[in-house]
Swiss-Prot record:
Transmembrane segments: none annotated. SUPFAM superfamilies: Cytochrome P450 (SSF48264). The lineage of its organism: Eukaryota, Metazoa, Ecdysozoa, Arthropoda, Hexapoda. Its cofactor is heme. It is found in: Endoplasmic reticulum membrane; Microsome membrane. Its EC number is 1.14.-.-. Keywords: Endoplasmic reticulum, Heme, Iron, Membrane, Metal-binding, Microsome, Monooxygenase, Oxidoreductase. This is Probable cytochrome P450 313a3. One of its GO terms (cellular component) is endoplasmic reticulum membrane. Pfam families: p450 (PF00067). The gene is Cyp313a3. Belongs to the cytochrome P450 family. PROSITE patterns: CYTOCHROME_P450.
Amino acid sequence: MDTFQLLLAVGVCFWIYFLWSRRRLYMMHFKIPGPMGLPILGIAFEYLITYKRKMSIRTKYMDIYGSTCLVWVGPTPFVITRDPKIAEEIFLSPECLNRSSIFSKPVNSCTGDGLLSLEASKWVDRRKNLNPAFKQNVLLSFLPIFNSEAKTLVAFLDSLVGQGEKKVRDDIVRWSFRIATQTTVGTDVKKDASFKNDSVLKSYETFMKIIVMNVLLPFTHNKIFSTLGGFETQKALAKSNVNKMIGTIVDKKLMTKPESGSQPEITSVINKAIELHRNGEMSREEVQSECCSFVVAAFETTGDTVYHALILLAMFPEHQDTVYQELKELFPVAGDFEVTYDDLQRMVFLERVVNETLRLIPSVPFTPRETIRDFRLSSGVVIPKGVGIGIDIFATHRNRDHWGTDPSSFNPDHFLPDNVRDRHPYAYIPFSKGRRNCIGWKYGLMSSKLALSKILRNCKVSTSFRYEDLEFVDNIGMELAQSPGLEFHRRT
């Protein structure tokens, strides 16, 4: 009995200490409203039992408790917001530069230390060093790749004419992967067997599945669970395949010595990373990790932007007709044509369509950060160091205070110049914003517009799927519960 009483006393003391050490977290909850959820689990149980309806969970709580609220995921508090004013404070604050460890650890375990997952202290210099790889002249040098791969995609879609509705999301993502890989490590990758037979694409898809699982169900990141579940083996095989392909290209470039006195040519991420490696600013492993990270960040997001734009235009043929008329003026003859940068600048309505697509179906629906130090909101509320804080991009883009009484409607006129000027600058944030925005956002818009221009000049798309039946699944990248099929009709 004495032993039991001693253990009980120790347990009570430990519990009191545990609660006391977290007192600032509990006090924060008095100032930021939100649900407590179940003991230990918080609201995590809802993510487990409502897998295909997860996008509605955060929205539900923000509708109840306000545009900024606090939720508990297990024993961990997380502040979420759809308020553009609060989003601006977060994005511009040096205290919120770190990505949440819930996100960064799974990414790092697959791709290594890259811009996607680096902690702020390392990210600042790395971002500054890699910015030249995304300057305008470099992006323009990608146009031949964009045109060539878009031609291949259009030819494939044309082969589907007369076959009824087809599921083409995976085929469009494959196109996106091909351009992401070539613009990251160079066109020599097309000679690699693993690139040609899509095995390296499958490896990247394995990365994405494991990252998503680890983020949504953090306990799966545990090494023991991951090993018993076979995920460590899958991850190791995928990393081996990707590292072999990228490593071969890195080795080849390192063997090519730059001419004495010549300026290094910056035409891709890998070339800039190799230059930094030669200057002693990046290790060889970091070069490889950065290349891997860029492909992970680019291929599904860009592919989904194109796919989502196509399904929305198929659902709203009046807007598709307007796009077609704009493209027909630019390219009177259908078939294969080269799209220039000047052509892209003239696609005014198509750009509005792409922006509206990214508003309604953002490629990344949620941006998680973690406070480096105590962070004070303009309201006076202090969010302690180490607390997760995130912007719900999906909900921000449908905030009635900024998008009107029917924010879920598809209306490209939301992006007419007058409407953009009158709106809060952080009401539309598909590529994040502020200090740690997406380095490749111009790349994403350019490649998406070019591919869409070729597809929509050559094909009319239709679908029997209704807009109101779209269901959105909360994920790292936006996911549809059902991917609508598309039917293609040849234009002349």
